[in-house]
């Protein structure tokens, strides 16, 4: 059985009250799907902006984005690519 995988970027905005410890725990849970991540501090607005590139099934991407959005002081949105990749599960 093949699994559909998608590439997406999850944009995360962390305000000064953001729970960064919990954010990192959640990202670590999904580490097997994360291709890369980049964080940028925006001092003028007192926020941090993180972009996470992920290659995973759509339900995994949605679950991660949803969990991140429920954290205190954190907003997130997922942007999906149009390309799909079908892979066979590992034995």
Feature annotation, model-predicted:
Residues 17-33:
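Short amphipathic alpha-helix segments
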Residues 23-27, 63-70:
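Short amphipathic alpha-helices in soluble, non-transmembrane regions
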Residues 28-31, 35, 69, 73:
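Signal for well-folded cores of large energy- and translation-related assemblies
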Residues 35-51:
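Amphipathic, hydrophobic secondary-structure cores in small proteins
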Residues 36-38, 72-83:
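Conserved short beta-strand edge segments in small beta-sheet-based binding/regulatory domains
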Residues 86-91:
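Conserved small/polar residues in nucleotide/adenosyl-binding loops
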